[in-house]
Amino acid sequence: MTITLDARALMIESIEQGLADGSLEIGAAVRRLRTEVTGLHQSQFAKMCKISVRTLVHIEQGEGNQTLKSLNAVFRPFGMKMGVVKVRRSL
């Protein structure tokens, strides 16, 4: 699978926006990044990120209590990392 750099950037931006506005959960975001942006299988992507396939599966399925280190490992190839954002309260 080959995509242009512009298309790749737009996909990543769309996923970032989904995470920011809460319409996309972390697991779904990781799965979309892996499949749509890299086109890698879970075993290939896990190896690239230096995590176990089991950890990647748990992240993508939203299971368990993942470490910040593992989450950052899967976001790093896309220029992202976990962070803290202010919650907007409606008045």
Describe the predicted segments one by one.
Residues 31-32, 43:
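Residues within the helices of the helix-turn-helix
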Residues 28, 38-41, 66:
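Residue-level signal for the short linker/turn that defines the boundary of a DNA-recognition helix
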Residues 1-28, 89-91:
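N-terminal flexible/basic segments that precede or flank functional cores
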Residues 24, 35-36:
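Short amphipathic helical patch at the helix-1/turn junction of helix-turn-helix
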Residues 39-57:
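Short alpha-helical DNA-recognition segment
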Residues 67-85:
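DNA major-groove recognition helix of helix-turn-helix/homeodomain DNA-binding modules
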